[in-house]
């Protein structure tokens, strides 16, 4: 009996060993175990100088890979796996090592005598397990941060919060890609490369990979590249598949500003650089220097605003990028204010339905228009009448307006502060203070959390903005002094809670490592570090903010050379709530992009690192494109996915006020708002399946931060090599003096980050200012006399002002 069991075990072990191939790198940097069906059972890789790491993988089940859709593969010989030839199309995978990298050779063949037109797609599932479900595993899961098809090749990368990066590259064109969204929830299972795909596809994609001729075979080479951080991606991809890569540190500029363009190429000959303006005109760029395989160009933004397309071209390869030359920031804020009135700000249970009041009020602070302000006030009063219980002054619980969601309360504090800033009526600030007290009394727990949603409520940010206007009043009123003290203590308690919870706080809906929770956490920690520079935890606030920002990078389009998406955080479940499209797709940028990234400006002011300033301006420019550049119309969010079949909710022109669903394909485009026509019946507060309900007004989150951080400010950096870069202004040297011209008249402050002492002259709209500045960082301008917006980054100047 024992002998039979032993023989059975030996036979099982032999079968298992025979059926599994093990491919090891000659350099010892990776090891792949592969099943008899060609599916990776385990993959270990070394990322930089770290020890070997197991890449999470789907080795069985629906998302197992690598695999072809609807096709089983079988082992043909060692490391080679093929499908049966009885199908019209046959498929195969061969695993190999090339130049030290794990390389897959993929083949699709038409075995028939007729052309095979691809009606859906020929998908190659990677099998990387991207499901962020277990908080204990969040930091080791590789998220599909960037996938990008180009006309002649493909590249992208998966990044884990712990910083490990797995880049992918193919020297062959791949038609498209898609992600394995799990239902309508908050998780993604894996990613697929669509080797062949029907049109339409974005113009940057190959436009001819939708069929196979009789007996035609197509081949693709796919290279896996483990890296220690995303900064290595452009050069590593360029080297791995010998293509030109375009790297942009900033993807936006105002007229007259200089943008750096880096072309990384291993060919030994500089790729041809072609820059086309909005009307197709050729735009010059100057080659500054060549360092190894890095060709560094400078482009000065012309006076014509719009999209500038960049092409780096060799004999075989064609790589694209773009830069957005923007209009003045004030134009976008003004349009957002107008659009907030054209769209309905809705009586609804979710703050996302009425956030347009932010744009309506903040635009009036900088660009006053009495008629527009009166219209805003009338609409707000009608909204308030329906939503608020006149007996308590807060929620109308009979209508179940919003009493269980702390974020509705915190955002209302913000709206009331904006209303006060626009109207200067003290009763509006009184109301904001009462609502802040309500947030604290009803929702703040003994541990400082706002009902567990400390980051998501952004309660500390909104109360800090309220305190900005309370500070002067504390010097004259004991009542305001007591209010300020209560609010200050609440913010301090919330700060300690975030310092403890970090980026692992609660989220709404299905739990995951979420862009909004993690992003708001690091942004709030940066705010606390900036407003408490001498506090006992200031250094810890800053340290944790920087660490979380780095982890959050995996959920951010931090590297994409596309100004429409740069800096957008990656979120994919909002369309069903915001614009009633019942299909998951990436929304990036989405409204919550700015709430996730507003701390970048604070980190720049704390560290002086140009990287953070570029993050801030790149993401603001991406989000500002929610305003159509030509028409001024507000759109909801950008969808990076190249091809998504949806039932889109559109206006039914045959039935007034009603909508209908139509078949559409969405791909790399802005999705329109629906609140201009999808309206709530008067005096009603709809549920989410009733007429008029939608959450697309969350898009106005972008313009809150534009008003605070971007409208009044310009920035100048002197780099260690002596070169100068500007944001929201232009600069000229006149001998030893720097002459600064702000981009628009609403700029009232210029921030300098200098390597040495210098004289400066600033041509503000109302007067010129002169200063002699030492090495380091300095603000020059009106400062707190420009008191219109809560400028949290000037907090310490505020509280010490006499």
Question: Across the structure, where does each feature detected by a protein language model lie?
Answer:
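Terminal, non-catalytic domain-edge segments
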Residues: 21-22, 230-259, 267-269, 305, ...
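Sec-dependent N-terminal signal peptides
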Residues: 4-14
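Beta-strand-rich recognition/accessory modules
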Residues: 23-26, 84, 123-125, 157-252
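Beta-strand-rich interaction surfaces with strong enrichment in secreted/lumenal proteins
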Residues: 92-95, 206-212, 284-287, 297-299, ...
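Extended acidic/polar, glycine-enriched regions
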Residues: 267-331
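Beta-strand-rich N-terminal accessory domains
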Residues: 19-105, 109-176, 181, 221, ...
